[in-house]
């Protein structure tokens, strides 16, 4: 998982921090450095202060996200990215992260590494309550839990979702106002 925040001149790549001028291009570079973590596909979600942009592709970062493509298609000073190595879900374009959703509190991009041990239970419960799933990835369960939360603020929706999931995981989320990082149940904004 790679996240870049240019609004405050920071780029977060797992535990590293550096200056950034183009969030999406720097995210692509970070994904390239982490290519060994997943080679099935890659994706980036960016935000320009008004609109979210998303690009997802099968294959390696260097084959899909050259600087020109990134700059043309992924505008904005905020970005998150993900290299896919599937542990759950089929190897389809739909399952490549980050995922993006509009909620009643605004848009959110979500990238996740790990395994949710209760994802089947949660997914079945969400479907019984009327949720429609687009992917076979357990990450979408997290997105659905965030969207379903009755809380009004995005961070509160995230907290609600985190308290429902079990397993080993790390998440990075991009909202209209912040980047949110979560490891197990520790939340960092």
Give the location of each predicted region.
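Conserved catalytic micro-motifs used in adenylation/nucleotidyl-transfer and phosphoryl/amide-
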Residues: 12, 95-118, 158-187
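Extreme N-terminus nucleophile/cap motif
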Residues: 8-59
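Short acidic-glycine loop/turn motifs at beta-strand connectors
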Residues: 19-21, 46-51, 103-104, 128, ...
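Acidic, glycine-enriched active-site microenvironments
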Residues: 58, 86, 125, 140-141, ...
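Structured interaction and signal-relay segments at domain junctions
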Residues: 50-77
């Amino acid at each position: 998982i790679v996240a870049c925040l240019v609004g405050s001149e920071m780029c977060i790549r797992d535990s590293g921090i550096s200056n950034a001028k183009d969030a999406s291009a720097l995210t692509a570079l970070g994904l390239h450095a982490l290519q060994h973590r997943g080679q099935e596909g890659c994706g980036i979600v960016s935000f320009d202060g008004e609109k979210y942009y998303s690009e997802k592709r099968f294959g390696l970062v260097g084959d899909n996200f050259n600087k020109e493509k990134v700059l043309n298609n992924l505008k904005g000073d905020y970005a998150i990215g993900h290299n896919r190595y599937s542990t759950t879900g089929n190897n389809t374009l739909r399952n490549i992260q980050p995922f993006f959703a509009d909620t009643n509190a605004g848009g959110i991009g979500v990238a996740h590494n790990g395994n949710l041990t209760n994802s089947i239970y949660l997914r079945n419960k969400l479907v019984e309550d009327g949720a429609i799933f687009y992917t076979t990835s357990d990450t979408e369960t997290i997105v659905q839990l965030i969207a379903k939360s009755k809380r009004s603020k995005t961070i509160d929706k995230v907290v609600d979702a985190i308290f429902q999931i079990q397993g080993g995981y790390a998440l990075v989320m991009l909202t209209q106002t912040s980047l949110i990082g979560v490891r197990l149940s520790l939340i960092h904004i």
